[in-house]
UniProtKB/Swiss-Prot annotation:
This is Pheromone receptor 1. GO terms for cellular component: plasma membrane. It comes from Ustilago hordei (Barley covered smut fungus). Residues 335-359 are annotated as: Disordered. The gene is PRA1. Keywords: G-protein coupled receptor, Membrane, Pheromone response, Receptor, Transducer, Transmembrane, Transmembrane helix.
Amino acid sequence: MLDHVTPFFALFACILVLFALGWHIRSRNVGTITLSLYLFFGNLDNFVNSVAWWSTAEDKAPGFCEVSIRLRHALYIAIPASNLVIARKLESIASTRQVRASASEHKKSIIIDLLISVGLPVLYVSLMIVNQTNRYGIIEQVGCWPFLSLSWVWVLLVAAPVLIVSFASAVYSVLAFRWFWIRRRQFQAVLASSASTLNKARYIRLLVLTAIDMLLFFPIYVGSVSDTIRGAITTSYVSWSYVHTGFSYIPQFSAEVMEMQPSFKARLILSRLVCPISAYIFFAMFGLGQEARQGYKHAVLKALVFCKLRKERQKPIQNHIVANIEVVTFQSRETSGGIDGSPHSEKFSINTPTKYEEA
């Protein structure tokens, strides 16, 4: 039997990962925004699948499964693609290749980031049908699961893109760290010259995030698919019709059947843990900073006021300052009354208008 703790572990991670999303949206950091959303939907899907198929393998939600398996498949490359966008940005800033850009250049940069972090997963999912042997399958305690034919085409369209994107992200991460280390003494000036919304502390947190992806998740993925690649790369792709024979059939597996396949069970458990662990790391990087804590405090105070458990703080009333201003007027030396003209003052509070007498 698979564990019953992971689904709730995923639900809590799903909530935590949204805490720092507001700051990422304000900073317009495409990589961290898409990574937050992917981790949110990945953990939510994990929780819903596990709860809906807690003790059954019945085909009871075909529409949901169609969406769920595509989301699961997309996440294989979506998370590394978002990390690649983050690593590219960090390397560009630290190498001083990113300077104050015009509006058109900034727009172009955002489009490129979106093509990598969103366009690439969409293309990846659209090619899923080439190797898809069934609409989906159902595994008790796991939920909907994609079933793919293993061949050299699977290596080309499924395994290789993830490895390439992950490797590119690792290269950019190393380069970003190298430039950061070279320019560490004047790095605040480097950030200022790049017109970046990042400060040094946030830059370091992003750098640590990409390093964790490079040192932890990339080796795990390589290790989990290496044996499969060795077996699949020598297997021919017979034909489209052969692969899709019986496409509408929905295979259903009980938890007891999974117990008899330890290698597949290990991959299942690993796949269920990647999103929650990634979300907790993401929260540790961005959900515990000073700006995040201030945001939590503000949100809690707002909630207490809304629930009428705390009075809303009144803004201090500004006291009006009464100024005793004098207006100086001048009289001519030769006046009809023979009065020796000399400057005299009138109180500002007197409503008599100031006049200049004719000479």
